[in-house]
Design a protein with these regions (language model features):
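Bacterial N-terminal signal peptides
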Residues: 53-64
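Serine-esterase "nucleophile elbow" of acetyl-processing enzymes
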Residues: 71-124, 134-142
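Extreme N-terminal basic, low-complexity initiation segments
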Residues: 2-12
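Alpha-helical cap/lid subdomain in secreted, periplasmic
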Residues: 46, 104, 111-114, 130-265
Length: 265
């Protein structure tokens, strides 16, 4: 097995005929001296000609091995891009990158045979207003499906539920205008805001899901909220084990979502 560097960040490894060619190129550059090290014009010309030939051979070889195979190209064409637009619960606040919601959801879906890429569209501290404001640039143009996970910070700040509903309405409409398959993730308000606020807030999600005929995952933190062993020290954000619970519960909803998105392509 031989290797060469395409750039400072990319190393290619080759074997078989590719290894033979690469080793031959290396020998050529070792055996033929630099024009600055010899006085003979003949050696210089021969070295230059061989160097140019080998350089073109190397360029051709790199272009061949670096080009995506038909299988890779086909997989990319058939893949589904799912974006999770949300707040710190989506962003993976306080967690190692691999322990966040989006990478674990992608792993869950891929383990079940889905060719999917899950994009982290979460911003810690974001409200529904913030999610709406950044929708156009936060949701990739090549996205096929979206999970909308917003509203927790609205409730924590006591924002008028009517404003939250209006923002989520616009996000759903923008998603549908883009042709995205939508999964709406519900949220509940903390009890300290009183029963009237909690009731008005909780009604936002099923109402919008029915109005726009989109699937609803009733409560994003189902099975995790108020469980000390499943949350960080702040008692609000899930830890890695908590994320596992969330993914296992929302996972089947996400499977149906991307299957629906794939069938519409």
């Amino acid at each position: 097995m031989a290797s060469f560097f395409v750039s400072k960040d990319v190393e290619k490894r080759v074997c078989g005929l590719g290894e033979i060619l690469l080793l031959a190129i290396r020998r050529g550059f070792r055996e033929y001296p630099s024009p600055w090290a010899v006085a003979s014009k003949e050696i210089y010309v021969r070295h230059a000609a061989i160097s140019i030939t080998l350089a073109f051979a190397m360029i051709f070889f790199i272009s061949v091995v670096a080009a995506p195979s038909p299988v890779q190209a086909s997989e990319k064409e058939n893949s589904v891009t799912l974006v999770a637009l949300g707040d710190s619960l989506t962003a993976g606040f306080g967690l190692q990158p691999a322990d966040g919601f989006t990478p674990k959801l992608e792993a869950y879906l891929r383990a079940r045979g889905h060719n999917v890429r899950v994009v982290n569209g979460g911003v810690s501290g974001d409200t529904s207003s913030g999610g709406l404001a950044r929708f156009d640039w936060a949701v990739p143009q090549d996205a096929h499906a979206i999970i909308i996970e917003l509203g927790a910070n609205d409730a924590l700040r006591g924002i008028n539920p009517n404003l939250t509903r209006a923002n989520l309405t616009k996000i759903i409409e923008k998603s549908k205008d883009r042709g995205l398959s939508v999964l709406l993730a519900g949220m509940l308000a903390p009890p300290n805001l009183g029963p009237a606020y909690a009731e008005a807030f909780a009604a936002i999600y099923p109402t919008l899901a029915a109005q726009y005929d989109v699937p609803l995952y009733p409560f994003f933190l189902d099975g995790v909220v108020a469980q000390k062993s499943l949350n960080l020290a702040d008692g609000i954000h899930p830890n890695a084990a908590g994320i596992d619970i969330i993914v296992s519960r929302i996972g089947p909803y996400a499977e149906r979502l991307i299957s629906n998105a794939a069938s519409r392509e």
